[in-house]
Amino acid sequence: MIEFVKGTIDYVCPQYVVIENGGVGYQVYSPNPFIYQINKQETIYTYHYIKEDAFSLYGFQTREEKALFTKLLNVTGIGPKGALAILASGDPGAVISAIEREDEAFLIKFPGVGKKTARQIILDLKGKLADVVPEMIGNLFNHEDHIQVETQQTALDEALEALSVLGYGDREIKKVYPLLKEEKNLTTDQYVKKALQKMLK
């Protein structure tokens, strides 16, 4: 079991990053790959997902993120893609709060989460997340933003592609596109977070 990979970011795309360590490139799926910068040294905490002939690595910036991902995977009806979409919201505190309040309306805003799955999330996780994110709730994903040299349109296009990978449909993406166009000088990571904030209102 690989607890984490420490190395240099070699490649970033909407689905995953490649981190190189000892001449080996590890393909790691991430909630928002654009938080990473190419050629930068990083430590990614990994989770192995094995199902039949599928073997995948999922990676997170903190052990707390990884623990929350693991908890979500234990919920019937939630797979890796669904768990990543929930984590990509950038506000785990709001997710945990919704679970504790039994706020199904908030949870069904995530791709692939219907009323039945939302109810299952609440049944399985309510009262069981305090050990996952102690005093870090609310600030868990507020990492220092990376400064990237990229044009605004390129960043926006990459963000829209990332939203599609997370499972959001064309209708939802088109709805937030005009709002994102009004934002200036944002990185891809910031565009994704801004879009998810607007979608989850």
Swiss-Prot record:
Segments for region (Domain III): 151-201
Cited SUPFAM superfamilies: DNA helicase RuvA subunit, C-terminal domain (SSF46929), Nucleic acid-binding proteins (SSF50249), RuvA domain 2-like (SSF47781)
Subcellular location(s) per record: Cytoplasm
Keywords attached to this entry: Cytoplasm, DNA damage, DNA recombination, DNA repair, DNA-binding
Domain observations: Has three domains with a flexible linker between the domains II and III and assumes an 'L' shape. Domain III is highly mobile and contacts RuvB.
Region Domain I, annotated ranges: 1-61
GO BP terms, alphabetized: DNA recombination; DNA repair
GO molecular function, one term: four-way junction helicase activity
Species per Swiss-Prot/TrEMBL record: Bacillus pumilus (strain SAFR-032)
Role description: The RuvA-RuvB-RuvC complex processes Holliday junction (HJ) DNA during genetic recombination and DNA repair, while the RuvA-RuvB complex plays an important role in the rescue of blocked DNA replication forks via replication fork reversal (RFR). RuvA specifically binds to HJ cruciform DNA, conferring on it an open structure. The RuvB hexamer acts as an ATP-dependent pump, pulling dsDNA into and through the RuvAB complex. HJ branch migration allows RuvC to scan DNA until it finds its consensus sequence, where it cleaves and resolves the cruciform DNA.
Disulfide bond sites: none
Segments for region (Flexible linker): 141-150
GO CC entries: cytoplasm; Holliday junction helicase complex; Holliday junction resolvase complex
Family to which the UniProt record says this protein belongs: Belongs to the RuvA family.
One Pfam family in the UniProt entry: RuvA_C
Subunit structure, interactors included: Homotetramer. Forms an RuvA(8)-RuvB(12)-Holliday junction (HJ) complex. HJ DNA is sandwiched between 2 RuvA tetramers; dsDNA enters through RuvA and exits via RuvB. An RuvB hexamer assembles on each DNA strand where it exits the tetramer. Each RuvB hexamer is contacted by two RuvA subunits (via domain III) on 2 adjacent RuvB subunits; this complex drives branch migration. In the full resolvosome a probable DNA-RuvA(4)-RuvB(12)-RuvC(2) complex forms which resolves the HJ.
InterPro entries (alphabetical): DNA_helicase_Holl-junc_RuvA_I, Hlx-hairpin-Hlx_DNA-bd_motif, NA-bd_OB-fold, RuvA, RuvA_2-like, RuvA_C, RuvA_C_sf
Organism lineage: Bacteria, Bacillati, Bacillota, Bacilli, Bacillales
Protein name in the entry: Holliday junction branch migration complex subunit RuvA
Region (Domain II): 62-140
Entry keyword annotation includes DNA repair: yes
Superkingdom assignment: Bacteria
